[in-house]
Amino acid sequence: ECFIYPHNLGEGKLYGAQENDFNYYKACALSGLGRKEEATELFLAASIGNSQPAAAMYYNDQKPDKIFYQGLALRKLEREEEARGRFNNLISYGEKHLYDVFKMDYFAVSLPDLQIWEDDMNKKNRIHCNYLMALGHLGLGNNEKAMKYFDIAAEMDNNHQGVQIHQKMI
């Protein structure tokens, strides 16, 4: 049911929104039930999409965990080199952009979700970059490093849903 958007929400799925995580978890469930062919199809679906991280400051930007799930799906498909590439992309982006100074760049509906509250966008960027590095290290099995970056992100935003969900994977 996670693939179906209720009509009464007033807005459906955003155009181009990826569902790598949904596909990955459904594939894992099907695999566990012995339905290998169906699982493989969903792992393939989970493995595709934009593999280059971005700032993800706007509500319609691809979230970094989608790339993380691409990597996990590729690993299930025994495409380890490609999987590691996804995880390394997350780490590289986080390291490169950790101290970037954020410059507002929006048009019409892409205004950042919390701009009305005047958030510190540089802080949000640092949280985002630490989260990216945590996901990358988690995917590579570097659990100590992953926990370090999850902890930094959580210290800056203890309500970060991605951190709360993925930190429990360690």
Placement of each model-derived feature along the sequence:
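Amphipathic alpha-helical segments of tetratricopeptide repeats
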Residues: 4-11, 45-55, 91-92, 154-155
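TPR alpha-solenoid repeat register
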Residues: 22, 55-56, 100, 129, ...
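Alpha-helical adaptor scaffolds
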Residues: 88-128
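Residue-level recognition of tetratricopeptide repeat
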Residues: 19, 53, 80, 97, ...
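"A position-specific structural signal for the A-helix of alpha-solenoid helical repeats
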Residues: 18, 24-25, 32, 69-71, ...
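Flexible helix-coil transition and linker loops at the boundaries of alpha-helical arrays
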Residues: 7-16, 52-59, 117-121
